[in-house]
Regions:
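N-terminal nicking endonuclease/strand-transfer module with a His-rich metal-binding environment
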Residues: 1-147, 151-181
Length: 181
């Protein structure tokens, strides 16, 4: 498990960097997407440059509801807007071996979506945030030998910027996720 909310310079991620991260996770190669021809999941080994907004792998919980049909540009604009001076926007990655993903039952995009929905509670609990205030976007990358899920998330009710996260908290998130997977 890896979690960041500041760059190597120690400064919080800018609104444009957070917006770029949305595009990066949703459209990069190896992203897992629903096929448009059927309701089956299809693995995309190469990036497709289609303009339809469903041609990305983004899913998440925004404005009180879950969706797996977000427009990249609309979500980039939304993330830019919520990336205020008083709100921390976190970038998290959960990585697996192919064997551990199989053991966890992560075979389809729906499996991964359910996994993220379930484990957002581990993140919110350890970060001492109310789960109902957490919004997130996520995308699964089936990188050879290292399937993983990127999650960009924030507390929509946050009023004070979080400058530093104790590494023990991130480790506890990792431990809790392992225990409950």
């Amino acid at each position: 498990y890896k979690q960041q909310h500041v760059g190597s310079n120690g400064r919080k991620f800018s609104p444009s960097r957070n917006a770029h991260y949305v595009k990066y996770i949703g459209e990069r190669e190896h992203v897992l997407k629903f096929s448009h021809e059927s309701n089956l999941v299809k693995y995309m080994g190469e990036r497709e440059h289609a303009t339809r907004h469903s041609d990305n792998g983004l899913f998440g919980y925004i404005n009180g509801s879950f969706s797996d049909n977000y427009s990249t540009s609309e979500m980039q604009n939304y993330v830019r807007k919520i990336s205020t001076s008083h709100r921390s926007v976190f970038h998290s990655i959960f990585s697996f071996t192919p064997e551990s993903a199989e053991e966890a039952g992560l075979r389809t995009l729906i499996d991964w979506e359910e996994w993220v929905k379930f484990h957002i509670s581990d993140i919110s609990r350890n970060m001492k945030m109310k789960q109902e205030n957490i919004e997130y976007l996520a995308a699964v990358h089936l990188k050879e030998g290292q399937p993983h899920v990127h999650i960009i998330w924030w507390d929509k009710a946050q009023e004070i910027l979080i400058n530093k996260i104790n590494p023990v908290i991130c480790d506890q998130i990792r431990i809790d996720v392992i225990k409950s997977t």
